[in-house]
Amino acid sequence: MLDFLELEETVGRAWHRLIGKTGSWPQYPDHAVQLVDIRQRLAICFRGFGGDIAVQIAPARARTSTHRLGLRRRMALGEEKLAQPLRDEATLMLPPEIALFPDRQLNYDLYVWLVGYMAVMPMDADALPEDALRRDLAALQIAEQTVERACRAFPGLKPRYKRLCAAILAERPKRPLHRLEQQVEARILSLLKQGADLPDDALPTIFPHRGPAGYLPALPVPLWPGLMKREEVAPRTGEDEPVRNSQSEGAETGRQIAQRERQDPRHADRSPFILNRFEKILAMAEMVSVDRPSDDSDEQNAKSADELDDLTLGERKGRPAARFRFDLDLPPEAVDRSLLTAELTYPEWDYRKGAYLPDHCAVLAAPVQEKEKPLELDAAAQSLVRRVRRQFEILRPGREVLRAQLDGTDLDLDAVVRSRCDLAAGGQGSDRVHLMSRPQANDLAVTLLVDVSLSTDAWVDNRRVLDVEKEALLVLANGIAACGDRCSILTFTSRRRSWVRVETVKDFDESFGPTVEHRIAALKPGFYTRMGAAMRHATAKLAEQPNRKKLLLLLTDGKPNDVDHYEGRFALEDSRRAAGEARAKGVNVFAVTVDREASAHLPALFGRGGYALVANLAKLPVALPAIYRMLAG
């Protein structure tokens, strides 16, 4: 009510309304297209354009652009952040929203063009020069060649690119620039006119070998994505201490593509003049494990971290007092290619080399420690167990009748008549004139592989993920016991490649009973999700079974990852390879997940029809038996 009395706040709000939103590109919010709404469609387009199936689509982060700003922008904030499209080996980074044109279809077409462009981008291009001028010119040359390649490979994109170039020409701002910057801008406009099939009267320009002092890069063109090369870093020797999940995970943030950089004190400014305000100087207290001086909300802290260009990360021991969710996509660690010596070792697939890393993962197999009390189920869950058992009893094999046997309880009349006719015709009769009945052979072996990584300690809809998994596992195990299928239950978690723990809840030759129920109740959240090694171990155990049909049913709540190099595309490619190896050995692989965002990577891992997404966690105990009946039938 009396906010107008705060002169500084009032003037600040008025100033922000006046010139706070003065971006280089115009924005048309009424015609905006959101990436989250069309990401699945764009993923299909990327695969259709020949892109690798394991490459993921993520929102690009708005980063500070160093191009020359107009007067109003310099007066407002002194910088401009742009969500420029980028690509690396594992990710397509697209703007979270495109509202560049006053036509929604054009904004959508820009997304499609970016996906087609990135599908043919040269991933082995040399790094751009350090000099700003030469970097601009090299980027324009790469863009020209890539546009030509995309239009030649996909002729249907050419009319779309023509319309986009004409629209970009109309929207690109005209700003006062230095002479050399004007020449680079003229080169950009010339390329856009060529794309739009417009006459171009620009003369060729000879550029110097280096840009002069004061040269600033050109304003990026949204049509031409950049290539991000991120070098691997040396493996860390220390162990990460996982942080237990709380009931509130906080708001979801976009994946932030980042670089690991070590600060070198020799590069610090050693000027004797203190020109900075003292509150901007980095204080030691910021890096010391002490109580924070204010009660800022974790949600606000997450939002503030999301807006930072530089975020200082450190390692600490012990459990922090508070945390927030922040998906930071750091470049992977270098792969340690040394061989491991252990009782059970499995290879790992390195997609970059196109070869296996032999004896790369050590699996520690052990039984689950039993708990004194079984899992306590409420009345609804107990009713579900009884209902599932009745449904699965129908699937129990009946007795099959064998005809023309040497011995049996009844005569096979057809065989008796046939034998008497043979004798009457002067032939030899047969003694196989009896009927025998026996139980039908149960020809299915199934392994339930359950992810018990740290993420299962999270709470969704006021229920812990692991508790719901236990309930679903207990319901399904009762059903499988009722139908008589041979079944084993394994859990897995990991902490680097030397410690992949696979525990046995139930073995194939073990009957379901109180002991197994106690083991299910004893399941606890572990660490990380090295899915490939666990799947290879489960496949090896299934391959030893004599049954003709084999099924590996994976229950997980997230995508594969570990604390070392096993993350991002490396983890996806290895897990996909492990699923392919299992199918090549005659093992059917099917995944069930409760991760609501898993639709982005599950098709790449298990293929079409190889997975099921249970969006509502509470429905997992009902959905899992239904999925099993479909697969077993």
Swiss-Prot record:
It comes from Brucella suis biovar 1 (strain 1330). Part of the operon norEFCBQD encoding nitric oxide reductase. Essential virulence factor, probably involved in the detoxification of nitric oxide (NO) produced in the macrophages during the innate response against infection. This is Protein NorD. SUPFAM superfamilies: vWA-like. It comes from the Bacteria. Residues 232-270, 290-314 are annotated as: Disordered. The lineage of its organism: Bacteria, Pseudomonadati, Pseudomonadota, Alphaproteobacteria, Hyphomicrobiales. Residues 445-631 form the VWFA domain. It holds the Pfam family VWA. Keywords: Virulence. Residues 232-243, 258-270, 292-306 have a biased composition (Basic and acidic residues).
